[in-house]
C-alpha cells in the first residue's frame, strides 16, 4: 500500500494486468535499469536486468550476483550495466565500492572503473557516496543519470 499510494500521489497512472499483458510490445530488446540511492547516511543499489537475447540456458548474469552488478554498504552504493560476464568476472561493483572505502570521489571512480573494460566491451556505472554522485559509460553504451530529492 505504501509504494502504490506514493506512486499515485506522484501522478503515476494505474493499469490492469490485462493491459500490461496485451500491449503487443516486443520486450526481446530490453535494457538494464539501475539506481543508487542515498538517504542521509544510508545507501542502497538496485538493478533490473533486461537480460540478453539467445542466452545459454541456465546463464546467470551479473545482476543477481552481489558484488558484481551491484553493491552497497555504509560508505556508498554502486550499480553497473553492460556485458554481464565481463562485469561478473571483475567483481566490478565490489571493487568500485572498495575505491569508495579508500576515500576516492565518485567523479574519479567512474573513469577509473570504465578503464578496466577494454573496447568493445559495453559498460556503464553509477556511484554514490558521502562525497557525491557520478555516472558514466564507455562509447559502447548509451546512458543517462538523474539526481532528485524526494521529501516525504
Role assignments for model-derived ranges:
Residues 1-152:
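N-terminal nucleophile
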Amino acid at each position: 500500500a505504501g509504494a502504490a499510494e506514493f506512486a499515485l500521489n506522484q501522478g503515476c497512472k494505474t493499469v490492469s494486468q490485462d493491459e500490461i499483458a496485451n500491449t503487443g510490445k516486443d520486450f526481446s530488446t530490453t535494457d538494464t535499469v539501475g539506481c543508487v540511492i542515498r538517504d542521509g547516511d544510508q545507501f542502497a543499489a538496485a538493478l533490473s536486468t533486461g537480460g540478453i537475447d539467445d542466452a545459454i540456458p541456465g546463464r546467470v548474469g551479473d545482476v543477481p550476483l552481489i558484488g558484481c552488478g551491484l553493491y552497497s554498504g555504509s560508505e556508498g552504493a554502486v550499480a553497473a550495466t553492460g556485458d554481464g560476464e565481463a562485469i561478473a568476472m571483475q567483481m566490478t561493483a565490489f571493487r568500485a565500492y572498495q575505491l569508495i572505502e579508500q576515500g576516492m570521489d565518485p567523479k574519479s571512480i567512474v573513469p577509473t572503473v570504465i578503464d578496466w573494460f577494454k573496447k568493445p566491451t559495453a559498460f556503464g556505472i553509477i556511484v554514490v557516496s558521502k562525497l557525491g554522485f557520478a555516472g558514466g559509460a564507455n562509447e559502447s553504451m548509451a546512458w543517462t543519470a538523474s539526481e532528485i530529492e524526494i521529501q516525504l
